[in-house]
UniProtKB/Swiss-Prot annotation:
It catalyses: Endonucleolytic cleavage to 5'-phosphomonoester. The lineage of its organism: Bacteria, Bacillati, Bacillota, Bacilli, Bacillales. The gene is rnhB. HAMAP family: RNase_HII_B. InterPro entries: RNase_HII (IPR022898), RNase_HII/HIII (IPR001352), RNase_HII/HIII_dom (IPR024567), RNaseH-like_sf (IPR012337), RNaseH_sf (IPR036397). A divalent metal cation binds at D78, E79, D170. It comes from Anoxybacillus flavithermus (strain DSM 21510 / WK1). This is Ribonuclease HII.
Length: 259
């Protein structure tokens, strides 16, 4: 029987990746309840890791099909901020290496702020290229949100340090000569698009937090410009500022009533 204590066993188990490991096999015969509990936790962890890798590989199917055709540089493109009443629309384009593995990458809306921030840093370290596009509230009013979104996406693609050979885009088509595939709910079905959604989301959230420091009465750092009850009440009380989208109904109606 292994004589090391439970804490030492717990620490060493983190280095074991295969149940055929000789030391692990000895643990299976250790009668201490604490040891057997750690063994079961190890099995659960490995099963969770297996499921996550399978999910990731499923999300890589669009990229893999392009890799199989000899295409190397694939940019995922996504945007954040089409619906808010204030702030810009932000798009990101991300080119990942072919052999990338990004566990837990997903549609940014499904992730906690902490997880998004963690993945944001990891993606920045691992990506071959990242491009950002930002279109202001004023230009959204001038163009309309759909055209502004396309412009932000094109800006993001043009900002890439590496020219992409193919674009994977979340439910959009942009007027560029680069071959592209539009994927419905792409941020949940493509690793590259999910990565771009995280970059765009964190980038925009940070901008809105800065706006919250400039205009603390509006609470932008909480609602990120979306039409929450708190935000609508602040608009009624304090009026419309430059960063509000005047073409959006709640803002337009507030302006009609006079500031």
């Amino acid at each position: 029987m292994i004589t090391v204590n439970i804490q030492e066993i717990k620490k060493r188990l983190q280095t074991i990746h295969d149940e055929t490991d000789e030391w692990f096999q000895q643990l299976l015969h250790d009668e201490r309840k604490g040891v057997q509990r750690l063994v079961q936790q190890w099995y659960k962890q490995k099963e969770a890791e297996k499921r996550e890798r399978e999910r990731f590989l499923h999300m890589l199917q669009y990229e893999q099909a392009l890799y199989d055709k000899g295409i190397r540089y694939i940019a995922g493109v996504d945007e954040v901020g089409r619906g808010p009443l204030a702030g810009p629309v932000v798009a990101a384009a991300v080119i990942l290496p072919k052999d990338v593995y990004l566990p837990h990458v997903d549609d940014s809306k499904k992730l906690s702020e902490t997880k998004r921030e963690q993945l944001f840093s990891i993606i920045q370290q691992m990506a071959l290229a990242i491009g950002i596009g930002i279109v202001s509230a004023r230009e959204i009013d001038e163009r309309n949100i759909y055209e502004a979104t396309k412009k932000a996406m094109m800006q993001a693609v043009h900002a890439l340090a590496i020219a992409p050979e193919h674009l994977l885009i979340d439910a959009m088509h942009i007027p560029l000569s680069i071959p592209q595939t539009s994927i419905i709910k792409g941020d949940a079905h493509s690793v590259s698009i999910a990565a771009s959604s995280i970059i765009a989301k964190v980038t925009r959230d940070r901008m809105m937090k800065q706006l919250g420091e400039k205009y603390p009465q509006y609470g932008f750092e909480k609602h990120m410009g979306y039409g929450t009850k708190e935000h609508l009440q602040a608009i009624e009380r304090y009026g419309v500022i430059e960063e509000h989208r005047r073409s959006f109904a709640p803002i337009r109606e507030r302006l009609k009533r006079g500031e």
